[in-house]
Structure formats: structure tokens, C-alpha cells
Amino acid sequence: MWYVDGDNKNGESKLAKKAAFNSDFNFNLYEYFHFCSKMLKKDDTQPVARGRSSNSPCMIVFCSWEQQFTLIQAAKKHGFNNHIPLVFIKNYSPQVLKANMRVVGATEYALLLYRDRLPKFRNGLKIDENGKNIPGTGHMVFNWFEWERDGKDIPKIHPAQKSVKVLKKLIETFTDPGDVVIDPCCGSGATLRAAMELKRSAFGFEIDRTFYERAKNEMLVLPTDNQMSLEDYIEG
């Protein structure tokens, strides 16, 4: 519920009970997962050495704490049988008006969803010529990440825009250079920017023309003012 100047004594604002985004009232969660399941490549069937991940794909969905159970159940209906919860820790909170009232939120949440085999996982592990792990390489990746804010070089386009730095960390962990990253709810284009900077091919879908135009003309432009072209990053 939104109130004028944030005070319920002033009555509801004109934005109360309104959709934040065009798709808020007609977003079909099950159609969304059906769409994503068709885009995601099939699980890798090749055997892997003990203690290593497969080259299977995964899907990462940012969500609120309360949405997690609903998403897990919907994902299972479309073949995403497993999940790993992810937490992102911020050193700031948008709940400034509540700072003297209660504990404020300073986290974001996501679900890593996958079908049956653990997805591709890159933690710096190196393999020698005999296929053995090189001691001292590889490190634990916790299920929580620090939320690094972007600098002024990254335009602010979407209210729910994610940090390019955070997205790059996730992309580096679950893909290799040359892999394909797809964002079905592209918004600001931050995912495409992160993928392209890491030499991954990237595709995005966005139904809002305003966000699409701004992402194309602001986010997907290099500091040299040479606009990124998707074709430049798609492997043949």
C-alpha cells in the first residue's frame, strides 16, 4: 500500500494498487517456466570425474524471500527438480524510513534451478595433463554473495535493475567463455552487458518498448561510444 509522502494519515497515493510494471497483473508464471525450459539446453549426459560438476545448464531467478516456495513448486512442474537458494548481502538498505522502527532489509534472494544433474560450476579448479585436480586451485563458493554496486559508468534504467558486477560473478561461476546466456525478462539489459563483457553470447527478451530502447541505447554501449552488436558476440 502506498501513501502520500509515505504517511498513512495522508491517505493513499495515486500509485496505490497500481501495477509497478506492465506485466504485473497478467504475468503467467507457468508459461514463463515453460518458455524457459524450452530455451535451456538439455542436461549433459557425459560421465564426469568424481567430485566435479557436469556441463549441464541452470537457471537463476531473482525473487523475494516470500516468493521462493511458489517458484520452486512452479519450476518442478517444468522439469526443474532441484534448487539451491542464493543470498546477496548489501551494505545499505532502501528502507530508510523504517530505520528507527525495526530491523531493515539489506538482502536480495535468488534461486538456482536445475533439472537433474548439478550444473556447470567454475570455481578456479585447474586440471593437469593427466586429468587430475591441481592442488591449491579451486575454492569454495558460498551460497551468499556480497552485493557490489555498479559505478557511474552503468546507467540506471530499471527499478529492479541488478548490479552488473553481481551478474558477472554469477555468469563466471556457471558458464564458460563462448557459452550462451539468456535473459527472458531483460529489463535494463544488465545481464546482456555482463555476459558480453565476459565474452559470452547473450540474448534477451523484453516486452516494454521503453526499457528496450534505453537498454539498447544506454546499457549496451561501450565507454568508447561504440554500441555493442549482438552479432559480434554470437559464436558461429
Please give the residue ranges for each predicted region:
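Core catalytic lobe of class I
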Residues: 1-205, 210-212
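Conserved SAM-binding loop
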Residues: 215-216
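Class I S-adenosyl-L-methionine-dependent methyltransferase module
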Residues: 66, 220-236
